[in-house]
Regions:
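Extracellular glycan-recognition regions
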Residues: 20-133
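Bacterial Sec-dependent N-terminal signal peptides
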Residues: 1-21
Length: 133
């Protein structure tokens, strides 16, 4: 089963526009402060948390909060993601996750003072791709 993961590493607001309701989703690494208001999820994310596995950077983490729903087969998702990006590597986006060794995360990431489209593909080890917006 694949899990659609909605998560971030910055203050995050996500608005769902499909039949899936936020109230039916679940937390992994639940943040200390979050709320659902008017079909939008807002959270304050734990600093220095992330998803990354075994690479030449020398660390593995699987500790950022994310809110997810489990789907099998084909599905479609549409979300609006906003964040208060302040620190290097702050990010907000989506994750498709099978388990801790197999996932894809994509979103907007703040690197060296610039906003970037960022994607990490993980199949046992993580590989990062980034392009300036």
């Amino acid at each position: 089963m694949k899990k659609m993961i909605l998560g971030a590493l910055a203050f995050l607001s996500i608005q769902m526009t499909s039949a899936q309701t936020l109230e039916k989703m679940q937390w992994f690494n639940e943040p200390a402060k979050w709320e659902i208001n008017d079909k939008a999820l807002s959270m304050f994310v734990t600093p220095q948390s992330d998803y990354w596995r075994i690479s030449h950077y020398g660390f593995t983490v699987d500790d950022a909060p994310f809110y997810y729903a489990t789907y099998g087969g084909e599905f479609e998702v549409k979300v609006k993601v906003t964040g208060e990006y302040k620190a290097r590597f702050d990010q907000a986006g989506l994750m498709l996750r099978i388990d801790h060794e197999n996932y894809i995360k994509a979103g907007i990431e703040f690197v060296d003072g610039k906003f970037n489209l960022s994607t990490v593909v993980t199949h046992k080890t993580s590989d990062w791709s980034v392009i300036s917006l």
